Amino acid sequence: MDSLGSVLNMDSIDVEQFVRDGFAKLEGIVPREVGDAARALLWQRIGLSPDEPSGWTQPVVWTADLTGEGPFGQFMASPKLHAALDAVAGPGGWHRRGAVGNIPVRFPRVPPADDRGWHIDSNTMRADGTWGVSTRPGTLLLLVLFSEVGTDDAPTRIRAGSHRDMVKVLEEGQVLDPMQMGPIFDEVGPDRPLALATGSPGDAYVVHPFTVHAAQEHLGTEPRFMAQMPVLLTKPLTPGDATPLARAIDW
């Protein structure tokens, strides 16, 4: 099991690692102090204190950034992030986000939540506006860290290379409900190397829409603050696309 401390140089995304493993780490898309400032705002929003662990009674508390204010806007405007998304999806191949969106805060010292199954995120909008999983994804996944995340701090688990397995089990033309696909997800890539999305405030991970991943129990001492957001593509991923997104699954 690898903890991914330095898979990139500081200037660009490792495209070949993204193609091979279905994800790549971006170190310091913003300075650490910007991540620290974002975390301070999130503590205020959830009404808890880093200095009062007695108030940490739930394994997961959800909050959000819906406006892109302050440090959150700095994350979303990061030139390094934009360059990485250009490199993976192609210039003009993705829609810029103004806000971070949903942010689950995971707490230690309490029984874990029952939300740790292997999965891929919904990636395709149906005609009625609901979302599911298909072979023509319209999103990729972005993980953004607002706290120090070590191997014990509930880092997202990633089955490296599982994107190549996942694409083979999805049926052409169907948009499936990921909530009903648990047994399928469990069987996709179980022998693949396990990687952990560790890092520092200001780091991020770009994840292929077919890469199987999962949450895990927090075994550390400090809460983990991490956003998980879809980045919309300008068109669904299609065989023959001249991008690393397509090349990663041999299209």
Enumerate the language-model features and the residues they cover.
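Non-heme Fe(II)-dependent double-stranded beta-helix
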Residues: D2-R20, E27-D128
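Non-heme Fe(II)/2-oxoglutarate
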Residues: L48, A84, E171, I184, ...
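Secondary-structure boundary elements
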Residues: A87-R96, T135-R136, F146-D152
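A structural signal for short, well-ordered beta-strand segments
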Residues: I103, L142-V144, A227-V231
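A short secondary-structure junction signal
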Residues: A113-W118, A127-T130, D152-G161, V167-E171, ...
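Short, structured patches in soluble enzyme cores that scaffold and shape functional sites
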Residues: I120-S122, V144-E148, A160
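Short, P/G- and charge-enriched loop/turn segments at secondary-structure junctions
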Residues: R126-G132, R192-P193
